[in-house]
Amino acid sequence: MADVMLRFLGWRSLLIHGDPSVLDRWLWLRRNLRKGAVRTFDAGCGNGAFSLYAERVGNDVLAASFSEREQEDMRRRAQSLGVNGIELRTIDLRMLEQHRGELGRFDQIICFETIEHVNADETLVKSLVAMLEPEGRLLLSAPYAAHRPLYSEEQHPSPVEDGSHVRYGYSPERLRQIAERADLEVVSQGFISGVVSQKLTNLMRRLTRRLGLPAAWAIVLPLRPLALLDAPLSRILRYPYLSVALCGVKRPAAAADGD
């Protein structure tokens, strides 16, 4: 289904193929990603939408995922779009330290909705920061600790690293603490995906279980423009957001230590 949409709508179709929060993350990314000829690492690239966007705005991109299937899907989609500026790697981010030398340095790193999948989250963030050039930036997002459980989501996940969440979420203070302990200066922080996006995500998950993904996607599609009301309604209702995100810049002292 994703490949059919790709032929008609291009890379942007990947932003609306999954749940509505994917588009929300891209909107945040668009405001914080450096454009132009910079080297970008997408750590935990998923369906590749953010990697494709980074390539489209001039970045030299390396996209990594532990899933060979995701990487093969990404390779096929990039070829279909005529995209040549993305290098693909199958990497278990828990073992990132073993790959640092071969991967090199980056001007910016995207790590969205990934650290909640690993027990050693602080270690992973420190490894990512060590891969940044001086004054490079890390764009980091993770589930918000106070969000309401989505349909089928475990509020008390198992600590076993099996690909699912090992942690329910992070407070903004905790995410900032992790970043600062890794020698990042946090320059911006915010929330992603409010009440509308979460309700649409729940609806899509329920419909997918009952009717399958194509039917669920078609039913939810006309409702997606309601996301324009997401921020104001979330404020009025005081509804907790789904994710917390930050942009951190590598401190000069940390840059010197990483050499």
At which residue positions do the language-model features occur?
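A short His-aromatic
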Residues: 113-117
